[in-house]
Structure formats: C-alpha cells, structure tokens
C-alpha cells in the first residue's frame, strides 16, 4: 500500500496543518524582526518630538505623509470598483474614530514614555481578544489561556503599583502652562479627576485605548471587504483623517505659540516615523500574516517589539545614541524621565509570557466515531465534533460558582467566613504596622497570613470533596480532605518543632522584648481565634457525621442503592463472577477515627493560634509586672509541646487512612460480619477480604466468595451486601467463584500456585446435595 494511503498517516504526523519549510519562513521572521526594531525606534523618536510639537499637529503630519505615499503607490482611486457615497460616509466615520484612538495612544505616550507605551498599547488583536474571552466568556481556551490572562493582568498591575517612574521630573515638566490647548487640558483634567499620578493615569488611558483599537479593528473588517481590501481602506482612511485634522491644525497654528525652532530639522525624523510606524509595519505585518500563521506573527511581533523597546530604553540617553540621532535632535536636552525600573522589567517579562500564551492556537482534541479497523489493526475514526477536553469557565463565572459551592455546605461556609475574618484582621494589622513603622506588627501580620494559607488549603479541600468522580478519578475526590488534614498536621509539627528549638535557645539567653504593642495585638488575635474555635469545635467533636452532611440536622436514610452483580459466561465455562453492592448512607455514627480530617486540621491550626495569643498575653503580663524575661520562652515551650501532642492523633488517623488500614472503630463489626458470611447458605468460604476507609463518609471493601455450583448468585450477593452494610461498608465489590471459575482460570494459564491454592481450598470442602458442608 502506498505510504500516503496507509493507516499510519495520523501516527506519522502527516495529517493536520500544512506548514512551509522552516528555511522559507526564516526570511519572514527576520523581516518581521527588523520591522519591529524600526517601529520601536520610531516610537522613541515620536516621544522626543512630542515634547515640542503639539499632538494634533504631530498626528496630522503622520496621517498626511502616510496618505501621500499610500495614494501614490496604492492608487486607491483608480484601482478597484467605484466607491459610492454611502461607503464614503463609512470611511469618514472610520477616519474620525481612527484619529481619536491615535490621539489617545500618543497622549498616553507623552504620559508614560515610549517603553511603557510599547508594553501597553502594541498588542495584537488576537492577544486582546483571547484575554477578553478568558475573562468574560465560558470558552476561554483552557487553563493555558487562563494562565496567560493572569500574566497580562499581573503585568499591568506591576506598571501601576511597582513601576517607580520619575514622577518628580514629570511634575516639574507639567505645570499648568503645559496645557497649551483645550484637548490636552481636558485629558489632564480627566486624569486629575481620577486622583492618580499622570504616569498611572497614562497606564489606564493606554489600556483603554488598546481595547478601543481592537474593537475598532474588528469592526473595520467588514468595511475593508466592502471597499476592496484592507490596504485600500488604510490609504483612504489616512487621507480622510488628514483632511479632518487640517482645520484643527490651522486653528492651533494661529492661536498657539510653536516651540519648534526649525521645522526643517524635523523633516528626517518625521520621514523615519512615517516610514517605520505608519507604512512599513502595516505592510510587513500583512505579508507575515499571510505567509506565517496569525498566531505566530502576533507572538514573534510582540516579543521582538518588547525586546527592542527594552534595549532602546537602556541606551536611549547614552552619548553614542545621541550621536546616532543627532540629526533629529530638537535642541532640547535629553530627559532622564521614564527610566528603566524593576517594576517595568518584571512587567515586560509578564507581557512577553502573556502574549506568547494568549497568541498560541487553542489545541483541541477531537472526538470521533469508530468506523472500523485498517488491515494493520489500527482503529479508524470519523471526526465530527469539537474537542474531548472541556472548555474552561470564564474567571468571573468560576469565582461565582466556587463561592456558591462554598456557601452551600456547612464546613466550607465556616472556613470561608473565618478566613475572611482572619484576612481582615491580618490586613488591618499590616496596615497599622506600616503606619506606625512597627516591625513586630508587620511580622505578626505575615505570620497570620501564613496561617490563612492553611485555611485556604482546608477550604479548597472542602470544595474538592464535592467534585464529581471522573473516568480517571473514579472514586471521586473525597480523600482530598484526608490529605489536607495530613498536610496541615505536618505544618503544625514543623512550626511546633521550630518554636521549641527557639524557646530552648532563649531559655539560656532571654532577649529584651518590646511589649508596647504585644498586648493589643494578642488580644485582637485571641478574639478572632476564639470565634474560629466556636465555629470549628462542633466539627472537631462530632467527626464524620458532620463531615458527610451539609448541616446539623441532615442525615442519610437506609434506602441503600444496591447494584446486583452481572453474570458473565465465557465460552461455555459457566463462569460467573463479580458482584457489586454499592449501598450509600448508613446510619452509624463514627468515632474520632472517621471524623473529617480536614476540619480537624483547620481546628488545630486555630487552636494553635489561640494558644499562641494566650501565651503572649501571659508572658507580656509577667514581663511587665515582674520583669521575668524567661516567661516568654517558657510559655513558648509549653505551647509548642501542646501543639505537638494535639497533632499526633490527627497524623496517626490520617496515616491509617492513607495506608488503607481497616477502620479501627469497625474492626469488631467486620470480623463478626465475616463470620456471618461464612454461615450463609451456599457459601463455602471467602478469601482476600479487604476493607478500608476511603473518606470520612465512605468505607470501601472487596471480598471473594467460593460458592456451591447450584447456588443462586443474586441471592448470595444480596445477603452478603446486607451483612456488610450493617457493619458499615457502603462501597462494596463482591467476586463470586465456583468450580467452573477455577477451570476457567486454568484455561487462562493463571499462576500455578494461585490455582493450586484455590483448588485445594475447594477440595477440602465436601458437601452434600442439600448444601450441608463437611470440613
């Protein structure tokens, strides 16, 4: 069979997107790199020119220069069909909106500087649309897209909060006299109304302009098709924009004083900006999108632009760079504002990662119908639909659904309320510590923040236990609460150990302690933790009956969903096996071994904090009244010992569950149940009984039963399921074995010793036809 018609097309990777050879793509990637480098240089040059040229005049020159070149080369009037009047009105609207977006972008450039403008405004439409779809739709593209959206938001936050821009220099350059037109005055007034600095207002303005630009480009696609192509629309729109701006420029030239000493010195800078920013970038990006994938073009373009922007920002004020751009200087001294900072570097890294993720194509697997097999035995599928993978929810919807699930159940609701209270106290403590410059308050606030991580772990575990079972996690996620309790217990043991070691060290050499703020902080922490103890003590004392219900008065009846076994006969062997008896919701109360380990771990964390607050209050009183500095390490020793001793039972119970130990509180009932099973009519013996606790509310078990050849299997399954259900097992699997089963196992070439053991066990039990067994 010819290779192209073989069944190995899928495995050989020959089915899918047809890609050009890498050597042919390299030239376009190199071209895109140099284009983005020139565009970054043009943006930096634009920032310098905007210091002396009014923003409206600057935009008019760019639009007019771009229109002249495009009309000459593109010939939008002679090529293509004639444009009717209705289309000219649409072009006029397109040009006006384009001018507004460009004005916002260039004004943001004057506020934030060239590098930050590149990072905020120069993103592909694909990236922004992917970001918005993650945030506001249910088809965001999976966890990777959500991660990319998070990186993008973090990058913007870094520019807002951690970018230490030279605000003092900006304030010195921004007196009221700088408002040389109504437009700039209105924009500055709007930013001042927000109550933020010009730099932060510029960040917000550029983000808004970016969203408007993407929406504008998306809406313009239909118009470009009607006009006769995007290039023709671009040429006509720039020409109309220049015509619209011309009266405004004439009025500004007549009413304002120009800061330009010589317009002839700006000819080359303007020509370079028009060529690199307005023309070259548009045409090269169109070519690369046609030759490369749109996602690859967007990803490479953003990375190249950001990296060149970082490079230029580092060397723009260097003397060598000044010599290179000496022909375009305007007589102004180079400014030192908008320099590189740690915040902008971190932001650039996050922007690069976000654009790389958000511009990547959504890889969706496909579900198909099995239509047959190839001669080699390879399955053949008919692909009809979308991916097997589930679409991820949008972030607001995910938060809303999670909060709804948290507030539905008692345990998670209690943890959530206490977490909110704890976080509120933590941030108040941190704020007051920063306000008063108290290192003790700040350190205690971060300690409380660490404690909140244990509550978050417990809350997440309580939420996961209600997730539905999947094909991979067929038992569900009930055991997550055990893992949460185990991890919280380990955290507490580590904390207790380090507190104990530090206390022993301080016993030898007690340090001086500043007790000024200890008492109010400890009293506040004690009040918060007492609320937590009251909230979690019920769960701590009631155990699994609390962990498996939603409220205090909810219980499970004995309706017991039973699934009878299916009898499988194989080729005349008469082999029957496997009984599944799932019965949910027994009415037995459990002792501490079956209690909710997750809630126990949370309770012990709160108890440890409470003991710590009590210890601090006692030691503070003793130090203030009697000067006993040794009281602090003694209280710490006592508290760490209590924490350690209280955690041991939790770790012991969690380890027993994780090691699949038979539940201790059910051990006697299970042994008695096995004796009753031995006496059921038709049961010869049993082997391999396994019983373990899966979670606080689920006890699982498996057992093999040897039966007489003429017994009714369903009756035996029903009786055995009832016996083990009374013993507390609510997830049961039964395998029935008759004489034909051993013959079948021998035919399948099972292990000799296994078959021999089972055969000897069967032969040792002789029984009459009436069912009387003789051992």
From Swiss-Prot:
Residues 547-592 are annotated as: Disordered. Its main location: Golgi. Zn(2+) binds at residues 447, 451, 605, 609. Pfam families: Cation_efflux. It is found in: Golgi apparatus, Golgi stack membrane; Cytoplasmic vesicle, COPII-coated vesicle membrane; Cytoplasmic vesicle, Secretory vesicle membrane; Golgi apparatus, trans-Golgi network membrane. It catalyses: Zn(2+)(in) + 2 H(+)(out) = Zn(2+)(out) + 2 H(+)(in). It comes from the Eukaryota. GO terms for biological process: GPI anchor biosynthetic process; intracellular zinc ion homeostasis; response to zinc ion; zinc ion import into Golgi lumen; zinc ion import into organelle; zinc ion transport. Residues 571-589 have a biased composition (Basic residues). Heterodimer with SLC30A6/ZNT6; form a functional zinc ion transmembrane transporter. Together with SLC30A6 forms a functional proton-coupled zinc ion antiporter mediating zinc entry into the lumen of organelles along the secretory pathway. By contributing to zinc ion homeostasis within the early secretory pathway, regulates the activation and folding of enzymes like alkaline phosphatases and enzymes involved in phosphatidylinositol glycan anchor biosynthesis. This is Proton-coupled zinc antiporter SLC30A5. It comes from Danio rerio. The gene is slc30a5.
């Amino acid at each position: 069979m010819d290779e192209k018609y073989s069944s190995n097309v899928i495995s050989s990777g020959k089915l899918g997107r047809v890609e050009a050879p890498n050597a042919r793509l390299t030239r376009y990637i190199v071209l895109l790199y140099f284009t983005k480098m020139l565009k970054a240089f043009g943006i930096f040059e634009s920032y310098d020119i905007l210091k002396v040229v009014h923003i409206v005049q600057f935009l008019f020159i760019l639009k007019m220069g771009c229109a002249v070149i495009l009309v000459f080369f593109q010939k939008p009037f002679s090529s293509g069909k004639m444009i009717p009047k209705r289309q000219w009105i649409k072009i006029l609207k397109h040009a006006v909106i384009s001018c507004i977006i460009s004005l916002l972008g260039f004004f943001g450039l004057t506020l934030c500087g060239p590098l930050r403008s590149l990072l905020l405004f120069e993103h592909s439409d694909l990236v922004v649309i992917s970001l918005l779809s993650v945030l506001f739709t249910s088809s965001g593209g999976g966890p990777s897209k959500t991660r990319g959206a998070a990186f993008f938001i973090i990058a913007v936050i870094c520019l807002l909060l951690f970018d230490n821009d030279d605000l003092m220099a900006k304030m010195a350059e921004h007196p009221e006299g700088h408002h040389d037109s109504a437009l700039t005055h209105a924009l500055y007034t709007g930013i001042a109304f927000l109550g933020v600095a010009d730099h932060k207002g510029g960040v917000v303005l550029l983000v808004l302009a970016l969203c408007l630009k993407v929406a504008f480009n998306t809406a313009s696609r239909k118009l470009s098709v009607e006009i006769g192509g995007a290039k023709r629309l671009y040429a006509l729109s720039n020409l109309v924009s220049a015509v619209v701006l011309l009266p405004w420029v004439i009025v500004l030239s007549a009413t304002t004083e120009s800061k330009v000493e010589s317009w002839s010195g700006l000819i080359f800078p303007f020509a370079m900006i028009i060529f690199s920013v307005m023309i070259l970038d548009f045409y090269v990006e169109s070519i690369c999108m046609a030759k490369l994938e749109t996602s690859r073009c967007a990803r490479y373009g953003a990375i190249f632009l950001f990296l060149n922007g970082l490079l230029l920002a580092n060397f723009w004020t260097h003397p060598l760079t000044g010599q290179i751009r000496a022909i375009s200087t305007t007589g102004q001294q180079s400014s030192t504002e908008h320099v590189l900072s740690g915040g902008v570097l971190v932001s650039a890294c996050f922007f690069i990662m976000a654009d790389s993720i958000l511009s990547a194509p959504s890889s969706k697997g496909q579900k198909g119908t099995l239509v047959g097999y190839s001669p080699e035995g390879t399955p053949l599928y008919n692909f009809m639909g979308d991916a097997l993978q589930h679409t991820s929810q949008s972030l607001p919807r995910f938060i809303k659904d999670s909060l709804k699930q948290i507030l539905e159940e008692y345990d998670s609701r209690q943890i959530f309320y206490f977490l909110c209270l704890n976080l509120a106290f933590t941030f108040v403590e941190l704020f007051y510590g920063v306000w008063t410059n108290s290192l003790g308050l700040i350190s205690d606030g971060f300690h409380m923040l660490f404690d909140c991580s244990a509550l978050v772990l417990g809350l997440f575990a309580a939420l996961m236990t209600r997730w539905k079972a999947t094909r991979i996690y067929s038992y569900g996620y009930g055991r997550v609460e055990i893992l949460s309790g185990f991890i919280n217990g380990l955290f507490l043991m580590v904390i207790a150990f380090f507190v104990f070691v530090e206390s022993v060290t301080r016993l030898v050499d007690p340090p001086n302690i500043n007790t000024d703020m200890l008492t109010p902080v400890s009293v506040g922490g004690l009040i918060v933790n007492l609320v937590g103890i009251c909230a979690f003590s019920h769960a701590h004392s009631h155990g699994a009956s609390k962990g498996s219900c939603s409220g205090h008065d909810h219980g499970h009846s004995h309706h017991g969903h039973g699934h009878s076994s299916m009898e499988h006969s194989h080729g005349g062997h008469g082999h029957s096996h496997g009984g599944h008896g799932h019965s949910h919701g027994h009415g037995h109360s459990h002792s501490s071994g079956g209690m909710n380990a997750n809630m126990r771990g949370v309770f012990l964390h709160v108890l440890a904090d409470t003991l710590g607050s009590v210890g601090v209050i006692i030691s503070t009183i003793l130090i203030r009244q009697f000067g006993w500095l040794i009281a602090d390490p003694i209280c710490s020793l006592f508290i760490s010992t209590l924490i350690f001793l209280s955690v041991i039972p939790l770790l012991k119970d969690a380890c027993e569950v994780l090691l699949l130990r038979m539940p201790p509180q059910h051990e006697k009932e299970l042994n008695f149940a096995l004796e009753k099973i031995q006496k059921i009519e038709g049961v010869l013996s049993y082997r391999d009984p396994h019983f373990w606790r899966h979670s606080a509310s689920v006890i699982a078990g498996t057992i093999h039963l040897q039966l007489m050849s003429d017994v009714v299997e369903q009756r035996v399954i029903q009786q055995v399921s009832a016996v083990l259900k009374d013993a507390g097992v609510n997830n049961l699997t039964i395998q029935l074995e008759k004489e034909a089963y051993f013959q079948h196992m021998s035919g399948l070439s099972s292990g000799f010793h296994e078959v021999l053991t089972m055969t000897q066990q069967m032969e040792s039990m002789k029984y009459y036809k009436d069912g009387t067994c003789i051992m």
